[in-house]
Regions:
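Basic nucleic-acid-binding interfaces
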Residues: 2-212
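Extended, well-ordered alpha-helical scaffold segments
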Residues: 23, 226-244, 300-318, 358-376, ...
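Low-complexity, Ser/Thr/Pro/Gly-enriched N-terminal "stalk/linker" regions
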Residues: 214-283, 302, 307-310, 318-326, ...
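Well-ordered alpha-helical scaffold segments within catalytic/enzyme domains
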Residues: 221-230, 286-302, 345-360, 417-433, ...
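Solvent-exposed loop and edge beta-strand segments that line ligand/cofactor-binding
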Residues: 229, 267-286, 325-346, 359, ...
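CBM-like carbohydrate-recognition segments
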Residues: 280, 500-624
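Domain-length accessory/inserted modules outside core catalytic folds
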Residues: 303, 322-335, 347, 351-362, ...
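Solenoidal tandem-repeat scaffolds enriched in leucines and small polar residues
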Residues: 369-449
Length: 624
């Protein structure tokens, strides 16, 4: 369906962009000197299709610590248009704040409109493949009234950290006269929707940004990755985990959240938390520990172990004891909650630390967390989501729960996290606790595979999402007793569905969709490291069981989704619009256009990448 247009798009990016590089160098000279730009000797055939008084051309200046400045215009020729942009940028009051003469400090972006077409307001959508589809980062939108146009450029999705059409309309309507009528966003959008005076135009653009002495062609405002390779994979693992390490606090916590667009640490889910008491999450903290351990496996660099110990000590500091039938248990208690997943992932992290280093100094807590997980398996095998929750039973331990309370506190993901920790303990020790862990673990696995789909069917989605359970089953099947057909089928069925619901090279609506997941074909793509941890677990399981053909299929799928996720990495080249690119570089974002980073956005991608790398490459590690 999309092969022809994608082949054409890829062919465009395979061109030699030397003329654009030279153009941007000359633009820089003209910005500095004020001398008129001359481009008569440059051949832009196949690169720029300039239409007289139709092709809008923007020039934007970016510099660390400065708000970008830009100007766009349309003139009779490409050269006249660029000279107008240069003239107006030089007149900007903030222009003197930019070191336009320094290619290492001030980056210049050239963006020009292509494929402009008029649509009706009713056609505008972000779901359907039709004349009015708006694709964030690919399409721009123009509102025109009384001969005046207001533009949202495709690259605005990156520079403004937007994700959907509503954010586009909110931004655009504010620039129109409607923006002065009311400060309420909903009222502005309502006025726009009822106004017959505005014409709507969809368009795409071509964009190039300087990087030192080079120019980089952008797609969806981002640097393009066109093929999978292990060097890129490895470098993104180490660099992103180093970013987590470099941004750790003295008490062992990680920097939880970073907004690259605004250079702030306040996360979108907790915007009202004071700056001196920002939200933190103990479960995702443990994911950061696992990422550090993966980096240590790949490098044998002791700096990661030093950081792991600090992070584990913080987790111990928020752990509380309680009694169980197997002895003293410990659970992670933070934000007034005792989450099954919080203790489960902590157990995973501590077990991984023990297995990789052989250091048994946390053994009291490993056993304590194991006992806690076992104590949260209900008599029918259901894993209870919370031990303490402030909204239930006055925040007291949830020992006796009725059916309504169990359902209200059930988590789709916590059981898989807890079962992975339990499996790691059961498979690596031979004491009575390990035997009990196996017994309880089997009961819980039977329930989650057979009963959860019946009781909690509403929690299942078209695109499988329980990667933790896939990893847990991979671990449990190392014990021959647990190689049950229904367990194994769960992993491979979900993995096959994930592979089916992945955009491929020739069926991708946009060329960077290749390797991205979707719920329904046509969805905006999901470059998802968390799900991919389940996919790579299926690869390891297939190899362990000797299913070579399936393993090869899974390996290729992992490579494909990894290449897609390469685009989430904030490289020096791609961080051009960030307020503080020195700080954001080496981190990994949530989404393609949103510029939010969280410790788990790094952890999931880096851990998926690490396991994929280790599946095919030799690496230094302490223990098998």
């Amino acid at each position: 369906m999309f092969k022809e247009q994608n082949d054409k798009e890829r062919e465009y990016f395979n061109q030699d962009f030397t003329p654009v590089n030279e153009l941007l160098k000359r633009i820089r000279i003209s910005l500095v000197s004020g001398v008129k730009l001359n481009i008569d000797d440059l051949d832009f055939t196949g690169i720029v299709e300039f239409e007289r008084s139709q092709t809008l051309v923007y020039l934007t200046l970016f510099q660390s610590g400065r708000k970008s400045i830009r100007y766009g215009s349309k003139r009779a020729t490409f050269a006249e248009t660029l000279n107008r942009d240069i003239e107006m940028l030089r007149k900007n009051k903030q222009f003197s704040d930019f070191f336009a003469n320094d290619e290492n400090k001030c980056r210049i972006m050239l963006e020009f409109v292509i494929d402009r077409k008029k649509i009706s307001p009713k056609e505008l959508n972000s779901e359907r493949f039709d004349n009015g589809r708006f694709e964030i980062g690919i399409n721009g939108l123009e509102l025109r009234k009384d001969g005046i146009s207001y533009y949202y450029m495709p690259t605005d999705a990156i520079t403004l950290s937007h994700m959907g059409l509503r954010a586009v309309l909110q931004t655009l309507v504010k620039r129109t006269p409607i923006g002065k009528m009311t400060n309420k966003i909903s009222e502005r959008l309502e006025i726009l929707s009822q106004s017959p005076d505005y014409e709507y135009y969809l368009f795409r653009s071509r964009a190039f940004v300087t990087y030192k002495d080079k120019c980089i062609p952008l797609y969806r405002g981002n640097v393009r990755y066109t093929e999978f390779d292990y060097d890129t994979l490895y470098n993104q693992i180490i660099n992103s985990v180093d970013w987590c390490l470099d941004n750790m606090y003295d008490d062992g916590r990680f920097l939880y959240y970073y907004d690259c667009c605004d250079d702030t640490y306040k996360d979108h889910e907790h915007p009202n938390r004071p700056v001196d008491n920002l939200y933190y999450n103990d479960l995702r903290h443990c994911g950061g520990i696992i990422a550090l351990l993966r980096a240590y496996q790949l490098t044998a660099d002791e700096k990661y172990i030093t950081a792991v110990k600090k992070a584990l000590d913080w987790s111990v500091s928020v752990s509380k004891p309680h009694d169980t039938q197997w002895g003293t248990a410990y659970f992670a208690y933070y934000n007034n909650k005792g989450k099954l997943g919080g203790t489960g992932v902590l157990l995973v992290a501590m077990m991984q630390y023990y297995l990789i280093t052989g250091d048994d100094s946390y053994m009291e807590y490993i056993k304590g967390y194991t006992r806690h997980v076992m104590s949260r398996v209900y008599e029918n095998g259901e894993l209870l989501g919370y031990y303490i929750h402030p909204a239930f039973q006055d925040g007291q331990p949830l020992i006796n729960m009725n059916d309504e309370e169990r359902k209200a506190t059930f988590s789709f993901y916590y059981p898989g996290e807890a079962l992975l920790g339990l499996g790691l303990y059961a498979n690596n020790f031979d004491d009575e606790l390990a035997k009990e862990a196996s017994r309880v673990g089997e009961k819980a696995l039977d329930w989650i595979i057979e009963e959860r789909p019946k009781i909690y069917s509403d929690l299942f989605t078209a695109l499988p999402s329980d990667a933790w359970l896939m990893q847990a089953i991979e671990e449990w099947t190392k014990d021959e007793h647990f190689r049950k057909e229904n367990y194994i089928n769960f992993v491979f069925t979900d993995a096959n569905t994930m592979m089916e619901k992945t955009y491929k090279h020739d069926d991708s609506p946009y060329i960077d969709y290749d390797g991205g997941y979707y719920y329904e074909y046509g969805d905006h793509y999901y470059p998802d490291g968390a799900r991919s941890e389940g996919l790579v677990a299926a690869l390891y399981l297939a190899r362990f069981l000797g299913r070579k053909e399936l393993a090869e299929k899974l390996l290729n799928a992992c490579k494909n989704v990894a290449m897609c996720q390469f685009h989430l990495y904030n490289s020096e080249e791609s961080s051009y619009s960030h307020k503080n690119p020195e700080r954001s570089a080496r981190s990994i974002r949530f989404k393609a256009t949103r510029q939010w980073v969280r410790v788990d956005s790094i952890q999931h991608v880096s851990c998926f990448f690490a396991r994929l790398f280790m599946a095919e490459n030799s690496f230094p590690k302490k223990n098998d």
